[in-house]
Regions:
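Blade-loop segments of beta-propeller domains
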Residues: 66, 70-72
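Noncatalytic carbohydrate-binding groove/subsite architecture in carbohydrate-active enzymes
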Residues: 113
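Major-groove recognition helix of helix-turn-helix-like DNA-binding domains
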Residues: 73-92
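Single, function-defining residue in the core of a domain
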Residues: 1-58, 62, 66, 88-90, ...
């Protein structure tokens, strides 16, 4: 009989151990755990994400009950206190670096975005995760609660998180946006919370395109008007120059597009520095920003990033980055296996079959059952008669 790894083992194999070890050497600060390796910690954290364990006790007990399977994963049982200490003391920067490495691997096999243009397309947004003020005082957000904010740049080629920064809930989105490095020719889509004319000017000068919604209090002067196809929902296509008190921060001409959604009848006004793509394409690009909202909703519903197994800042960041690595592993599993199933169904099936020895294709496309020989039925009839 041919040897077959468990699904969990197959997923972990997407992470080259030599790269894991190299990152481990680069982030070797903090307390040393002689009998609890970084790989062991990562394996336990990944198990909790993929199986939806509700607590530290639940996760450790469930994992330790699979001692035989742990051996084949290169891990071993661990005490709950040792695991908690490792999450608190081993720097989360290691898992951030591992997440970035995994994105680079996953983007190679991911499908391209749906648009005809070849520019890279990204959506930029942030999502708040509420925390208990008593348990997480370091993340104080308002008088009665704490929170952390996940700032994310979503790559529309495969809908992969390309950049993630985890901050306190008080940190404004635009502050993190300025730290993101994008390739020339990229298109980044964001909502009005990211309106910063100085940043828009920097993007323009670096050859990066942006698409956003114009603020209602924006002051500008129209310098050119272009005809539009109103049958496509377009209302206007103009070239403008900002003339308000902060207009000097972005002296470059911008493109202002009016659009009415034919389904919701809601009117939108978009602002961009791209004068090449059609006005309808710009409107469609902004509508695609909804994909990052879907991404946030998916990870909150299917991964463990709302209940934490540690209360320190380091433990919270570690758990979130491991959750994002789990998301990338699921995407990589899906794209390489080329199965036509959504991530929602994929993670549900994997949760039930994590330690089953089979391929992913066998779970969704099981081999046909062999037909029983008619002689067997005749023998059964003779036996009971």
């Amino acid at each position: 009989m041919a040897h077959c790894n468990t699904l969990f083992h197959s997923m972990l194999n997407f992470i080259p151990r030599h790269q894991f070890a190299a990152l481990e050497n680069q982030h070797s600060t903090g307390r040393k755990f002689r009998n609890f390796s970084r790989w062991n910690q990562f394996t336990h954290l990944m198990f909790m994400q993929l199986t939806g364990r509700a607590s530290l006790r639940d996760g450790i007990q469930s994992m330790n009950s699979r001692a035989r399977d742990l051996y084949h994963l290169g891990a071993k049982p661990v005490a709950r206190a040792t695991f908690a200490d490792a999450n608190n003391m081993r720097p989360a920067s290691f898992y951030q670096a591992l997440f970035e490495k995994m994105y680079q691997r996953c983007r190679i096999v991911s499908p391209k975005h749906k648009f005809k243009f070849k520019n890279k397309l990204y959506s930029l947004d942030a999502s708040v995760i509420d925390l208990s003020l008593g348990a997480f005082p370091w993340a104080c957000f308002r008088r009665t609660k704490s929170a952390v904010k996940i700032h994310t740049l979503l790559d529309h080629s495969g809908f992969l998180p390309a950049f993630v920064s985890i901050t306190d809930g008080k940190i404004h989105e635009s502050k993190v946006a300025k730290s993101i490095r994008l390739a020339k020719g990229s298109i980044v889509v964001e909502d009005r919370a990211y309106t910063d004319y100085k940043w828009f000017c920097q993007l323009q000068e670096n050859g990066i395109f942006f698409v956003t919604r114009q603020k209602t209090n924006a002051v500008y002067r129209v310098t050119e008007r272009r005809q539009v196809n109103k049958n496509q929902g377009l209302c206007s296509d103009q070239t403008i120059v900002l003339t308000g008190s902060k207009g000097h921060l972005c002296p470059h001409p911008l493109r202002r597009i009016g659009y009415r959604d034919p389904e919701t009848k809601k009117h939108y006004v978009f602002l961009t520095n791209n004068f090449t793509l059609s006005a309808k394409t710009i409107a469609d690009i902004y509508k695609e920003r909804w994909q990052i909202e879907i991404f946030f909703r998916w990870i909150k519903q299917n991964l463990k990033i709302k209940a934490f197994v540690g209360n320190s800042r380091n433990a919270v960041m570690t758990q979130i980055y491991v959750a994002l690595i789990a998301y990338l592993l699921l995407c990589m599993f899906k794209y390489l296996s080329k199965i036509s199933v959504g991530l929602q169904n994929l993670i549900r099936v994997i949760q039930l079959n994590l330690f089953r020895r089979c391929t992913l294709e066998e779970l969704f496309e099981p081999p046909p059952h062999k037909k029983l020989n008619n002689n067997i039925y005749r023998q059964l009839e003779i036996t009971f008669n």
